[in-house]
Amino acid sequence: RDRSPSRGLGDVYKRQLSVVLCEKDDLASHTSSASTKLIHGGLRYLENYEFSLVRKALIEREILLRSAPHIMHPLRFVMPHDKGQRPAWMIRAGLFLYDHLAKRELLPGSHGISLRSHTAGGPLKEEFSKGFVYSDGWVNDARLVVMNAIAAAENGAHILTRTACVAVTRHADQWQASLRSQDNAEVQVEAKLLVNAAGPWAASFLHDTVHGRSGKKLRLIKGSHIVVWKLFDHPYAYIFQHPDGRIVFAIPYEQDFTLIGTTDIDYHGDTDRVSIDASEISYLCELSNHYFKQAISPSDVVWSYSGVRPLVEDADDDDNENASAVTRDYKLALDTDAAPVLTIFGGKITTFRKLAEEAVDLIAPVFN
């Protein structure tokens, strides 16, 4: 159901397991293609003391940039220092940690800059005279998902797109699954183990279809992006601080455009039909106008997209916690009371490979 089930296939087929992937729509048609398209450690997660997550993501960033340079590339980010936001010493400390939490060979480190003389300072308002530069990576997120699925198929996995898992029956030693395509053709599959990698649908699939339970729950957060005609003509991206504490990126996009996002809003609507609303567009335009000389308005938006992030929480966690403070890490829940089922809660695109590795390590004993 996307976020994305194909992310783990690369590791599964290498261990010679027989795999059927069931995707109710198309590959990467939901959350996986609605990211900010970054391979990054998550600089802002340091404020929440998520050092382990950041370190893991930084290690994965290095691995991914080496393994798929045709769909990923290094990207330098400029953070203008806004005197009304985080103090300079805090930013320096955070960037120092970001540079040193994991071994870094491919990317240059961070440093301070004068925006009066730096190329990236030209498009910014005069009030921003100092800033910081650091490194992360860009990724074609949808293509990454599709490439994983293609590689799995080439090694024997069966990839069934536009095919929903409509029912499962659990026995002591196996599952029986009923799969239905969009043209109403049905397929019956028997499996020794079921992996629930349904992203935003993982909790509902576990409860409604598998009839299982877990001590985890998903908090669904909508993230929206806007695309406007390019606001700058250089290869740097920007990371902006909003007065509400959130971080928003402005990234070169498809040569002629600038991608701006993301928002963080609790979502209770239809996960199959997610779209940006007027307040989100205004939010992103206003933040852009706070930093850039060239003002934009909602009428300048040439495209927008939205996705739902499945953030994992313990069942008794407070839903009133700020969405930005909820972890972007993942949790794996293996139920072996009868035929085993592994449910994946949460996750981010940067750590997809590590998640898959840990998931297959967890289920490997089932196959002796």
Positions of predicted regions on the chain:
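Glycine-rich FAD pyrophosphate-binding loop
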Residues: K14-S33
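Single conserved hydrophobic/aromatic residue that forms the stacking wall/gate
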Residues: D2-Y13
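Dinucleotide-binding Rossmann-like beta1-alpha1 core, especially the glycine-rich loop
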Residues: K37-A120
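Flavin (primarily FAD) binding-site architecture
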Residues: N196-H211
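Core beta-strand elements of the Rossmann-like FAD/NAD(P) dinucleotide-binding domain
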Residues: N184-L193
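Short linear elements at protein peripheries
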Residues: Y98-I150, H158
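A conserved short coil-to-beta-strand element within the FAD-binding core of flavoproteins
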Residues: T161-W175
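C-terminal catalytic lobe of FAD-dependent flavoproteins
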Residues: S135, D141-L144, A151, V210-S224, ...
